[in-house]
A protein has these predicted regions:
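Secondary-structure junction/capping motif
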Residues: 9, 15, 118-125, 135
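Cysteine-nucleophile active-site neighborhood
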Residues: 51-124
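Single conserved hydrophobic/aromatic residue that forms the stacking wall/gate
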Residues: 133-140
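Non-catalytic surface loops within mature trypsin-like serine protease
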Residues: 35, 117-119, 138
């Protein structure tokens, strides 16, 4: 599998994922959007990963490349059916690209949080793939 990785800041890189990808025989190409690199055609890639970053999805005036990136994500996912992984900002960009709304939370949610799964969410394919669960270890 050959992946296109969109990176928004030098410090927000693929990190440990590079080791896992290499061990499994996958290749990737990183595009540094914050450095002005252009997004290549998706046609030579098998998947799209969009990483995190310090900006917000609505800051197109400060980060003008966000508008082009959102259009690219929409095209890649809707028109081409490219598998997508979004981390932090990446999943927010996907949501907005496909018509969702992303806004600032009233309170920050950092770390492990308890969430409530809605009936609509429970019927989605993401939660139909695996019926396992985990319990986090107690911190010492």
């Amino acid at each position: 599998m050959h992946l296109l990785v969109l990176q928004h800041a030098r410090i927000e890189h693929p990190g440990i994922f590079q080791k896992f990808l290499k061990e499994d025989g996958h290749s990737w190409e990183v595009v540094h959007l914050d450095e002005g690199q252009e997004i290549p055609s998706i046609d030579s890639f098998d998947g799209l990963w969009v990483l995190g970053g310090p900006m917000d999805v609505w800051q197109e005036q400060d980060y003008p490349w966000l508008k082009k990136e959102k259009a690219f994500i929409k095209m890649a996912v809707e028109e081409k059916g490219i598998p997508f992984l979004g981390l932090c900002l990446g999943h927010q960009l996907l949501a907005e690209s496909l018509g969702g709304v992303v806004g600032k939370s009233e309170t920050a949610e950092v770390g492990v949080m308890e969430v409530q799964l809605t009936e609509e969410g429970a019927s989605g394919i993401l939660f139909a793939v695996s019926y396992t669960h985990l319990t986090l270890p107690t911190m010492m």
